[in-house]
């Protein structure tokens, strides 16, 4: 089973890197910023996977408490990478909505970063601390999805409504996946910790 998980993780890492490179190549030919932002998301995910992979490798053949399985190792790096990843996702949403305000970009990202830092500093370490830390990402993604739909609903621009409507299926699938991640984290971290 360990060998299977090793190759699974390695495959995900390779897919992230290849997708990031392909996104950059697509940007080079199309000049659509969307592809730069998408590449950024995949690069951030690859960095995070590498950090997890490294942590698991260094603890190989060493016993550690089951409660540490979802521990927040290297919280500064992890928080900065998560914030960068969320920033790229937010840039994709802003690009979809044709929004270009620096203030609109900074406020949600700063709020996410401050929320993560507050959880690290203010919540006592334990399962609830871990669950809140990881769930903030899903909370941010829910915010992004709701903001997209709210902006499209409120808009009088037919083109914007059509653009968002074209992405409706992807946004719904994303919302379902976010719900699954929250349920999985809730179950694995709070209900039956390893």
Regions found by a protein language model. Name each.
Residues 82-150:
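Membrane-proximal helix-loop-helix units in multi-pass membrane proteins
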Residues 19-24, 88-93, 121-122, 141-169, ...:
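Alpha-helical transmembrane segments in multipass membrane proteins, preferentially the mid-helix core
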Residues 1-5, 64-74, 93-103:
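Short juxtamembrane and helix-loop transition motifs at transmembrane-helix boundaries
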Residues 1-18, 134-138:
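Hydrophobic transmembrane alpha-helical segments in integral membrane proteins
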Residues 101-108, 131-136, 152-180:
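Membrane-helix boundary/juxtamembrane motif in polytopic membrane proteins
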Residues 9-63, 74-87, 109-121, 171-193:
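Hydrophobic alpha-helical transmembrane segments of multi-pass membrane proteins
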Residues 64-76, 128-140, 194:
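Non-cytosolic membrane-interface motifs at loop->transmembrane helix junctions
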Residues 28-31, 57-64, 94-100, 124-128, ...:
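Transmembrane helix-loop junctions in multipass membrane proteins, especially transporters and channels
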């Amino acid at each position: 089973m360990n060998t299977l998980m090793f190759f699974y993780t390695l495959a995900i890492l390779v897919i992230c890197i290849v997708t990031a490179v392909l996104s950059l190549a697509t940007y080079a030919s199309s000049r659509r910023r969307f592809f730069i932002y998408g590449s950024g998301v995949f690069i951030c995910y690859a960095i995070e996977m590498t950090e997890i992979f490294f942590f698991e490798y260094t603890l190989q053949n060493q016993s550690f408490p089951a409660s540490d399985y979802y521990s927040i190792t290297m919280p500064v790096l992890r928080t900065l990478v998560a914030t960068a990843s969320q920033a790229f996702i937010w840039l994709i949403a802003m690009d979809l909505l044709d929004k270009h305000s620096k203030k609109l970009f900074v406020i949600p990202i700063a709020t996410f970063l401050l929320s993560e830092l507050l959880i690290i500093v203010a919540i006592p370490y334990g399962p609830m601390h871990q669950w809140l830390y990881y769930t903030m990402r899903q909370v941010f993604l829910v915010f992004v999805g709701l903001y997209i739909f709210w902006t499209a609903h409120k808009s009088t621009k037919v083109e914007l409504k059509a653009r968002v409507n074209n992405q409706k299926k992807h946004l719904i699938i994303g919302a379902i996946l976010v719900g699954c991640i929250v349920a999985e984290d809730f179950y694995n971290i709070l209900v039956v910790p390893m």
